[in-house]
């Protein structure tokens, strides 16, 4: 069903395909606990290309490849000819002759599209300026573990955030509900928001934007945030921080959520900026379980696509 496909954006997949990714993620977690992981990548090589630094994504993905019996090759941009001006298309053509799949963390989403097109090999988005699909899969895996179902959630912060785009894509495909508390200045790209809205209309999903974080969080079972300033946004850092200063997830804000609410963050966190220490280190925090689940969703996607 999924063999040979690329994972660039969750909007490219059907509800049934996303459900399959989630089902296999839970299976992989069980296999890992039992130390009986199927070696579905035996004899296969995956190139991992990084234009941006990575901790959780690199470690989880490289570990996933090895657990499945595959061979990861890690390529930092500074190590290869891309850093000297080689076109992405040429790099992709060459990698496609050597490896069975490509995974990349890139500055521009268009780079992923070129890698997929010219390598003719399954290509997996490890984060772009547009989206972070593997993160969203791990997030909803965590939510289902905590509540037994995919419950609604509230995102507090930058309304154009790349992780948020993937959360909205998952919600839109699966017919769920998400509230976004954000200054009106921050929204996803018009083209991607149009696709999300079209999918939401088909599935019955509810996606609502609020300017008041307290109103958005009221009664929510999941409160989610991300860093205010992403890599590559340093030139607008101070402006963003000023606009977002009232969108910090605090102990006070969490009081407005459901009594059994959890706090989520894709990490890394800037403590004291988008979240208070007392929240991320508190009893409602699910961030470490969330981070662990990155491994199992990576194993799922690799086994299904390659």
From Swiss-Prot:
GO biological process, one term: citrulline biosynthetic process
Binding site for L-ornithine: 162, 226, 230-231
Enzyme Commission numbers on file: 2.1.3.3
UniProt xrefs under InterPro entries: Asp/Orn_carbamoyltranf_P-bd, Asp/Orn_carbamoylTrfase, Asp/Orn_carbamoylTrfase_sf, Asp_carbamoyltransf_Asp/Orn-bd, Orn/put_carbamltrans, OTCase_ArgI
SUPFAM superfamilies: Aspartate/ornithine carbamoyltransferase
Pathway assigned to this chain's UniProt record: Amino-acid biosynthesis; L-arginine biosynthesis; L-arginine from L-ornithine and carbamoyl phosphate: step 1/3
Pfam families: OTCace, OTCace_N
Gene Ontology CC terms: cytoplasm
Broad class of the protein's primary localization: cytoplasm
Binding site for carbamoyl phosphate: 54-57, 81, 105, 132-135, 266-267, 294
Keyword line: Amino-acid biosynthesis, Arginine biosynthesis, Cytoplasm, Transferase
Subcellular location per the Swiss-Prot or TrEMBL entry: Cytoplasm
Record carries keyword Cytoplasm: yes
Gene Ontology MF terms in the entry: amino acid binding; ornithine carbamoyltransferase activity
Top-level taxon of origin: Archaea
Function: Reversibly catalyzes the transfer of the carbamoyl group from carbamoyl phosphate (CP) to the N(epsilon) atom of ornithine (ORN) to produce L-citrulline.
Family of the protein in this entry: Belongs to the aspartate/ornithine carbamoyltransferase superfamily. OTCase family.
Protein's recorded name: Ornithine carbamoyltransferase
Gene3D superfamilies: Aspartate/ornithine carbamoyltransferase
Reactions it catalyzes: carbamoyl phosphate + L-ornithine = L-citrulline + phosphate + H(+)
PROSITE patterns: CARBAMOYLTRANSFERASE
